[in-house]
Design a protein with these regions (language model features):
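C-terminal cap of thioredoxin/glutaredoxin-like
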Residues: 5-25, 99, 103-183
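Structural alpha/beta surface segment adjacent to cysteine/selenocysteine redox centers
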Residues: 4, 8-111
């Protein structure tokens, strides 16, 4: 379970293909709305707790170095990810899913784009090969809305309280820093 607003989700995303190759596991990507999870569970973003946010910034940078991936704090964080996550729900199970997810994570956590700004978001979509108007139609469809809501509710029902959260069978692992246990 992931949300584009979570830098830890981005870091986990960069590693999961390797986990799948090494273990033979199939990764099932589950877009959820992290704000909905926080509301349902009474949790909050680490960014809302100054000391925790400062620590997490340093920790995320350490993990990016360990993983050998680009990572930059987004100067526009926090970002409302509702439309982006509906887009992920709309593309789930299609060939467009991974290119879309790649583009959104890159925009958020490598390029530091303001994805709440419509012209900026449209530019990111165009650069990734998506038609912004077609994207909005898909993201605003009732099917995408219902799918994202259902996945978010499923996450809460399974005990998810943050992102990323990975399940191996019924075993839950929270955070990108638990991938060694996932593997």
């Amino acid at each position: 379970f992931f949300d584009f607003g979570s830098p830890a989700s981005y870091l986990a995303y960069t590693q999961m293909d390797g986990v799948a190759k090494r273990t033979g596991a199939e990764i099932v990507w589950r877009p959820m709305l992290l704000g909905g999870v926080f509301k349902a569970t009474g949790n909050a973003s680490p960014a809302m707790v100054p000391a925790k946010g400062k620590w997490m910034n340093a920790d995320l940078a350490r993990f990016a170095r360990r993983y050998g991936v680009d990572f930059n704090r987004n100067p526009f964080f926090p970002v409302n990810t509702l439309v982006m996550m509906r887009g992920a729900a709309a593309f789930e199970g299609t060939p467009q899913f991974r290119p879309y997810v790649d583009a959104m994570f890159r925009a958020m956590w490598v390029d530091g784009k303001n994805m709440n700004d419509l012209p900026t978001a449209a530019g990111v979509l165009k650069a990734a090969g998506f038609d912004p108007a077609d994207f909005m139609a898909k993201a605003e469809s009732q099917g995408a809305k219902d799918r994202l809501k259902a996945t978010t509710e499923e996450a809460v029902a399974r005990g998810v309280f943050g992102a990323p959260t990975t399940f191996v069978g019924d075993h839950m692992f929270f955070g990108q820093d638990r991938l060694d246990f996932v593997e």
